[in-house]
């Protein structure tokens, strides 16, 4: 080994200094490198320790060449030509203790399997469950992990286990229907299970906007500030809908700053990464980039099969593996439509008291699986077709009538908008006369259940789907 721990530390610091000016090392990679502990130099190899396999993989895969270049600039007397990374979980807690007050740079990754922390500071009031806005059906336990979402899931768990100490903010982006909202709710539930008394609030950007507008109209600005600033974790969904909403952005900007300055966690989702978000000021986008940015992608076939299997288990229904694979191979656009295929198949089997087999699946899904994934269905087409099918007007569906015929048609239209488009629940609610997202959730759940109980409802949904998709071929 080289002489003394001090010379090893000096050599490693020299390497880090070189990497500071290397454009190939992103802020996130600097975070991973900060977890490295230099252990010694032997036979031309710089031995380094990290707390987990994930950190080792990130450094070896994304930093190898810059790291070798930096090592090559060390004093010739050290004779270092390469490096080796060893995983030592025992340094996990020590590396955690070095993560202090949040800075406008990313915190390093913290291994979700071994890492423990003290509760977040200043949790002063017990939560009121109604204020969290969390959906009980979304948890880490029923989140299916695959290559398309593994990193995002690990980051979400780390944030829940160490609010404002792992990544702050955590920014998750990707197309609608791929699990971003699921992760937000799961973070909230898991954090609350770990830290009794922690204050969590989930909100969509539309709801945040409406709250802000109402606070101005009712002269209740202080109440608005208290609602969003006197919390420990803010989970905000679909931030892209704040585009060009200048005053609302200003309100969110100050909310973000207050939470971040007081060591509170912020988690944000969007359909695009920060640098591609239009209609936002640079100062806002830069704050989105302070922590960790990660994405969720379209799940691969194996993950889609696992999602269907998990859904079938949760519904307590038996579906053969070959059926699950067939459905997963035909529906690849998003998780929402994937689960919708299972609902239709099991509803048809329940109505006819028949087992789920391949002929049944092919019959049920013949119209669902023939549409090209790239052929986007507009929600207005769904609403127009639904109105025509039930011999109603579009205004009837948008309006406030509670007659059985109109209410059922409206709920079916909401269900189809949820299944066949990428719109969020609040966005669908806005389409239907500015209704709350919980109304859409209720409609989606009710129609899913009625399809299993009433053949008329099942037939109406099936015929409407066929008509809508026929028009888009």
Curated annotation (Swiss-Prot):
Spans annotated as Domain III, AAA+ region: 133-349
Stretches for region Domain I, interacts with DnaA modulators: 1-87
Subcellular location as annotated: Cytoplasm
Keyword annotations: ATP-binding, Cytoplasm, DNA replication, DNA-binding, Lipid-binding, Nucleotide-binding
Record region (Domain II): 87-132
Gene Ontology biological process terms from the UniProt entry: DNA replication initiation; regulation of DNA replication
Origin superkingdom: Bacteria
UniProt keyword Transferase present: no
GO molecular function, one term: lipid binding
Keyword DNA-binding: yes
InterPro entries hit by this protein: AAA+_ATPase, Chromosome_initiator_DnaA, Chromosome_initiator_DnaA-like, Chromosome_initiator_DnaA_CS, DnaA_C, DnaA_dom, P-loop_NTPase, Trp_repressor/repl_initiator
Binding residues annotated for ATP, in chain numbering: 177, 179-181
CDD domains attached to this UniProt entry: AAA (cd00009), Bac_DnaA_C (cd06571)
Region (Domain IV, binds dsDNA): 350-473
Subunit structure, interactors included: Oligomerizes as a right-handed, spiral filament on DNA at oriC.
Domain text: Domain I is involved in oligomerization and binding regulators, domain II is flexibile and of varying length in different bacteria, domain III forms the AAA+ region, while domain IV binds dsDNA.
Stored HAMAP family: DnaA_bact
Function: Plays an essential role in the initiation and regulation of chromosomal replication. ATP-DnaA binds to the origin of replication (oriC) to initiate formation of the DNA replication initiation complex once per cell cycle. Binds the DnaA box (a 9 base pair repeat at the origin) and separates the double-stranded (ds)DNA. Forms a right-handed helical filament on oriC DNA; dsDNA binds to the exterior of the filament while single-stranded (ss)DNA is stabiized in the filament's interior.
Family statement drawn from the similarity comment of this UniProt entry: Belongs to the DnaA family.
Protein name: Chromosomal replication initiator protein DnaA
Gene that encodes it: dnaA
């Amino acid at each position: 080994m080289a002489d003394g721990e001090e010379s090893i530390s000096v050599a490693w610091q020299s390497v880090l200094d070189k990497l500071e000016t290397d454009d190939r090392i992103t802020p996130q990679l600097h975070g991973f490198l900060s977890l490295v502990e230099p252990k010694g130099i032997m036979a031309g190899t710089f031995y380094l320790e990290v707390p987990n396999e994930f950190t080792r993989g990130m450094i070896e895969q994304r930093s190898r060449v810059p790291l070798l270049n930096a090592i090559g600039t060390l004093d010739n007397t050290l004779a270092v030509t390469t490096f080796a990374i060893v995983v030592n979980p025992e340094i996990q807690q020590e590396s955690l203790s070095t993560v202090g007050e949040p800075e406008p740079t990313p915190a390093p990754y913290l291994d979700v399997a071994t890492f423990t922390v003290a509760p977040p500071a200043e949790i002063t009031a017990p939560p009121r469950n109604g204020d969290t806005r969390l959906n009980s059906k979304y948890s880490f336990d029923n989140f299916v992990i695959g290559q398309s979402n593994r990193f995002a899931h690990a980051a979400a768990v780390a944030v829940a286990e160490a609010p404002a100490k792992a990544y702050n903010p955590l920014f998750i982006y990707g197309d609608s229907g791929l699990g971003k909202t699921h992760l937000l709710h799961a973070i909230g539930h898991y954090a609350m299970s770990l830290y009794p008394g922690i204050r969590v609030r989930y909100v969509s950007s539309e709801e945040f906007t409406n709250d802000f507008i109402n606070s101005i109209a009712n002269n209740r600005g202080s109440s608005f500030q208290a609602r969003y600033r006197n919390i420990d974790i803010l989970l905000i969904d679909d931030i892209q809908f704040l585009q060009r909403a200048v005053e609302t952005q200003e309100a969110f900007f100050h909310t973000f700053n207050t939470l971040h300055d007081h060591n509170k966690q912020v988690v944000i989702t969007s359909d695009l990464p920060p640098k591609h978000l239009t209609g936002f000021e640079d100062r806002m986008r830069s704050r989105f980039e302070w922590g960790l940015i990660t994405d969720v992608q379209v799940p691969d076939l194996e993950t889609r099969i696992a999602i269907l299997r998990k859904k079938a288990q949760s519904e307590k229904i038996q579906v053969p593996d070959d059926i699950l694979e067939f459905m997963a191979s035909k529906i690849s656009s998003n998780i929402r439509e994937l689960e919708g295929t299972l609902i239709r198949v099991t509803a048809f089997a329940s109505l006819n008291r028949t087992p789920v087999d391949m002929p049944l699946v092919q019959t049920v899904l013949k119209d669902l699986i023939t549409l090209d994934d790239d052929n986007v269905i507009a929600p207005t087409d769904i609403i127009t077709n639904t109105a025509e099918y039930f011999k109603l007007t579009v205004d009837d569906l948008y309006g406030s009538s509670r007659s059985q015929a109109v209410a059922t048609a409206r709920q079916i239209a909401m269900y189809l908008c949820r299944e066949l488009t990428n719109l969020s629940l609040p966005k669908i609610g806005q389409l239907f006369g500015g209704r709350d997202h919980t109304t859409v959730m209720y409609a989606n759940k009710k129609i899913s259940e009625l399809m299993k109980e009433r053949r008329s409802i099942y037939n109406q949904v099936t015929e409407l789907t066929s008509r809508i998709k026929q028009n888009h071929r």
